[in-house]
Curated annotation (Swiss-Prot):
Cofactor(s) this protein cannot do without: Mg(2+)
Protein name (Swiss-Prot/TrEMBL): Enolase
Organism for this UniProt entry: Anaplasma marginale (strain St. Maries)
Cofactor remark from the record: Binds a second Mg(2+) ion via substrate during catalysis.
PANTHER family associated with the record: ENOLASE
PROSITE patterns membership: ENOLASE
Subcellular location: Cytoplasm; Secreted; Cell surface
Alphabetical UniProt keywords: Cytoplasm, Glycolysis, Lyase, Magnesium, Metal-binding, Secreted
Residues reported to bind Mg(2+): 254, 295, 322
Amino acid sequence: MGVRAVVLSARSVAKINRVVARQILDSRGRPTVEVEVLLSDGAVGRVSVPSGASVGKFEAVELRDGDQAKYAGHGVLKPVQRVNTTVADSLAGVSPFDQRAVDEILLSLDGTKNKSKLGANATIGVSLAVAKAAADSVGIPLYKYLGGAVAREMPLPLVNVINGGLHADNLLDFQEFMIVPVGAKTFADAAQICAEVFYKLKEVLKKMGHSTNTGDEGGFAPNLENNTDVLDVLVEAIEKSGYRASSDVALAMDVAASTFYDGTSYKFSGKCLTSGELIACYEDMVSRYPIISIEDAMAESDIEGWKAVTKRLGDKIQLVGDDLFVTNPALIANGVENKLANAVLVKPNQIGTLTETIDAIRSAQRNNYNVIISHRSGETEDVTIAHIAVAANCGQIKSGSFSRSERLAKYNELLRIEEDLGKSALLYNVI
């Protein structure tokens, strides 16, 4: 029996039998939601939900208990309880193979625009767990179940090697400094290149007398004085690893500009800058360093700033909207209409269902915006985003650094997927 026949057979039989949620802990030791969906044929899907530190104000609501006597208010027993009662009852007997129908039930149960009743941390856990259970039922990997025969493009990793901003306790304004292995031919090559640069970066920082402690996402968190010092160190590490800066390994940054914007100016490097002055700083950096991507270059509320930076740099580098779009198809459509950014960061927990996540990806792709699927700073060992990246041909992925197991879990899963695809696998090239 072929795969298609197996899928059709399973779809006519298997139904959702049980939905179970529980409270577990993420990589920062904070509670998060884990969901298991069990089907009538014994198939199981399990998903644990991440949480962000730098959160866009338009994101769907992450519901927490607020009880200061337990986990300093970070508990998630409220969304867990709602999954185990309201959601579980409503999904019992439903087919797991119609993802849009499942997600419409979740949206109807919540009934709010921002998932504030059930919590996006509950709905995304259920939504993804249903998809994983369906894939398990038909006996194929999630990326094949979601993407079919066209799912063969491996994402290029943007690897966070130096942390700053809200992700580290240091002096750096910018949140992430990343290396991008643009010269790689396969994902395995990309992983090797990034690992070798990461090793060398540690040596370089130690010789300079800097700490090699790591931040939330596994990157080093040295007390370098300013952002350009970081770029200098990264270029040095790349070249001392035997690679060429630019043609082998390029640089990317997540500025997270909303975190140092006060509504009128940007408090950057000890100065108050206008949008235009901050853009001029970016232009200078791009002219001096092999930077190919800047994420959240402007605050999500600084729409005129976004228009200006896109006009001035949009034909030179990738300008990624995270807080600007928060994985919301409507906000992406608005960005396209107003020529804001040219790439979209996708975080499934920002929007709250798999269907809406895929809709956001397709909306971006239809309008020739690049797509980068992303982890969060508070992560788990869950590897679902690796499968979505390949299934939807996202092209790029952010999963943190080459330390901390919750970060490497995604990279390791991509190595397995590339092996599974064999010679049909292709590595996306951002240049």
